A protein has these predicted regions:
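PLP-dependent class I/II
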Residues: 1-5, 13-23, 27-34, 41-45, ...
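Substrate/cofactor-recognition hotspot
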Residues: 9
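A glycine-/small-polar-enriched, mobile loop at the entrance of the PLP active site in fold-type I
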Residues: 38-43, 56-74
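Conserved N-terminal alpha-helix of the aminotransferase class I/II PLP-enzyme fold
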Residues: 65-98
């Protein structure tokens, strides 16, 4: 007898990234020599000075519940980071730490999307965004920007995607999967559109802030458009920059009423993020940042090597990215050469 599951779940596809990662793990367990290119995960170990603090936290008994939204110590480290690196001022009540930035964003989606509400998500996008909107009974709207636009939507595209039902705009820059990053001028232009639509909450996913090598310094929307400060939830985490994917620690800064709502949702799901991970995250955010710069240097070298190699393949083209550790190749001509109809078959 098959047991019924909700229509909500039936609308959502299992994460293809998780599925591919699981398949790679299975093949490795079978003794196959395979390289996994699925999950967005640094291959470096967590820097020793951070890992040591995590181990010390266990030994000193920092293994109990903390406040749902994170410890005061971690909040202060996040506040200092936002001020130091992004020019953003937040108080403790504006900060939420979660079990990964994925949870942070899901909390926000659940906090602002009612059934039938729309969320604008520029495509190409991280595969989880639309499904999280569907789980909230919302409708993902995905304006597409191709290689001819550098995988970045225009203000006109954003304006055209907005309706009276729009409640959320999600912007990931630098982008998973394209590596594209919006310039200060481009962010300002998108911000000018959003200023005309006060019902829209903006989520900026800045997870790849420190895996970045464009000539112009990284900037976040809330700092470029201070007029939108009261509507922007700036999300980030320690997973990518500090090679801490398994520690599961994300965070955000934003308007008190939204952050409070997100904390309420989190309090009824996971409660606080790991107390051990919080201690390690404090060490990451407050400590020596040379490890971040060193990893970024290697990611840039690998990026240049892979992109150059892809562009030598028949039927393949690949733009250079401004950051992240992804290469987003166009394989349309290659698919014609080998006689397949879509990228999954390829």
């Amino acid at each position: 007898v098959s047991l019924p599951v909700s229509k909500r779940v039936q609308r959502v596809k299992p994460s293809p990234t998780v599925a591919l990662t699981g398949r790679v793990a299975q093949l490795k367990a079978e003794g196959k020599d395979i390289i996994g290119l699925g999950a967005g995960e640094p291959d470096f170990d967590t820097p020793t000075h951070i890992a040591d603090v995590g181990v010390e936290a266990i030994r000193k008994g920092h293994t109990r519940y903390t406040p749902v939204e994170g410890t005061a110590e971690l909040k202060d480290a996040i506040i200092a980071k936002f001020k130091r690196e992004n020019g953003l001022d937040y108080g403790r009540k504006q900060i939420l730490a979660s079990s990964g930035a994925k949870q942070t964003i899901f909390n926000l989606i659940l906090a602002v999307i009612d059934p039938g509400h729309e969320a604008v998500i520029p495509a190409p996008y991280w595969v989880s965004y639309p499904d999280m909107v569907l789980l909230a009974d919302g409708v993902p709207i995905t304006p597409y920007a191709g290689a001819d636009q550098g995988y970045k939507i225009t203000p006109a595209q954003l304006e055209a995607a907005i309706t009276p039902k729009t409640r959320l705009f999600i912007l990931n820059s630098p982008s998973n999967p394209t590596g594209a990053a919006y310039t200060r001028a481009e962010l300002r232009a998108l911000g000018q559109v959003l200023m005309k639509h006060p019902q829209i909450v903006i989520c900026t996913d800045d997870m790849y802030e420190h895996i970045y090598w464009a000539d112009e310094p990284f900037v976040s929307l809330a700092s470029v458009c201070p007029e939108l400060y009261d509507r922007v939830v700036t999300t980030n985490g320690v997973s990518k920059a500090y090679a801490m994917t398994g520690w599961r620690l994300g965070y955000c800064g934003g308007p008190i009423e939204l952050v409070t709502a997100m904390a309420t949702i989190q309090g009824q799901s996971t409660s606080n993020p790991s107390s051990i991970s919080q201690k390690a995250a404090v060490a990451a955010l407050n400590g020596d940042q040379s490890c971040v710069r060193e990893m970024n240097k290697h990611f840039k070298q690998r990026h240049d090597f892979i992109v150059a190699g892809l562009n030598k393949l028949p039927g393949v083209s690949c733009l250079k990215g401004a950051g992240t550790f992804y290469a987003f190749a166009n394989i349309e001509k290659a698919m014609s050469i080998v006689g397949v109809k879509d990228d999954n078959a390829f």
